[in-house]
Amino acid sequence: MNLYAVRAIYKFEMARTGRTLMQSIISPVISTSLYFVVFGAAIGGRIQQIDGISYGAFIVPGLIMLSLLTQSIANASFGIYFPRFTGTIYELLSAPISYLEIVVSYVGAAATKSIILGLIILATAGLFVPLQVAHPAWMLLFLLLTAVTFSLLGFIIGIWADGFEKLQLVPLLIVTPLTFLGGSFYSIDMLPPFWQKVTLFNPVVYLISGFRWSFYGIADVSVAVSLAMTVVFMAVSLAIVAWIFKTGYRLKT
């Protein structure tokens, strides 16, 4: 593996975070803090505990996941789309660097930025509600797997998009609604039986459930199932990325 090339692209993408600090870090943290103020303090005080956990603390994993998913997609999609937009993708594809190294560089940088953001939001949440992390190693594992998986999805979107407006299409119309309906603000056990079954078709349910289990030891679905589904999502994303490079789909257009 050409580690010099990987490191160069990785450092370039990480440096972009410093140039867009307001958009990449500060804005998501402020937005999430507003959720804590509105749902955790104002509304949470009027809601009973869920599985013995205060409502403000209960929504912390879901809010971290909400930011993690959207920012992973945004970071990776813009990272690979911008070279296509400016035409520098040709230099990248003709350079002595493999497709694997390109993916590792862009996806690795996007995942790193998202994980840093997730940890900052976790620290910020501690200012609003008392927190406990029952399984910190599992928490970091779910954080890593989810960030990588959705960075891969963002990479795919960046290749598919033919305009800046399409970069926001999937996050706004698909990912964000699925996250809100995936148990970010409630346990799916609170839903009627029919909707509980329907909700299980939402892939984000498994991510949030497994991540919440790492905090409080409670989950809407089996932890093993959550982990397995996360790995499946990652494998599917990797397969699509491999197909893109094999066929050259929209790499030069």
Place the predicted regions along the sequence by residue:
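Hydrophobic transmembrane alpha-helices and immediately adjacent juxtamembrane helices
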Residues: 1-136, 141-253
